[in-house]
Amino acid sequence: MIDKLKIALIPGDGIGMEVMPEGVRVLEAAASKYNLSLDWQEFDWSCETYLKTGAMMPEDGMDQLRPCDAVYLGAVGFPTVADHVSLWGLLIPIRREFDQYVNLRPVRLFDGIPCPLANKKPGDIDFYVCLLYTSPSPRDS
């Protein structure tokens, strides 16, 4: 049984930087419940990094991530950086290197949260959107 996990933390940009500390708190609480220790290694890879260095991550970025047990990635994107830069400079390389092809997004209406859909209540909206990244890209040829 693994009692210590090494996790790569990539907050990214904008909302990623805002929500990741809370996500870390949640994961730390869950880990303590199961007597796990989390060893966080933070990487400053973002669109702001791209603006400073010309790259979303260093050339040896995958080598830096490989020893980790998991990658916890926030959000990337910046008004002055084209979306394809963060996509092909960070997200796609990580997904491909570590065979991460499923993006699972739960959609659930919680009690006490206003809903713009008429007459919907908790339990009426409860499903998952599953995006599979399996098709080759034009950049693969």
What are these regions (language model features)?
Residues M1-D126:
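Contiguous, glycine/small-aliphatic-enriched amphipathic segments in soluble metabolic enzymes
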Residues Y133-D140:
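Conserved small/polar residues in nucleotide/adenosyl-binding loops
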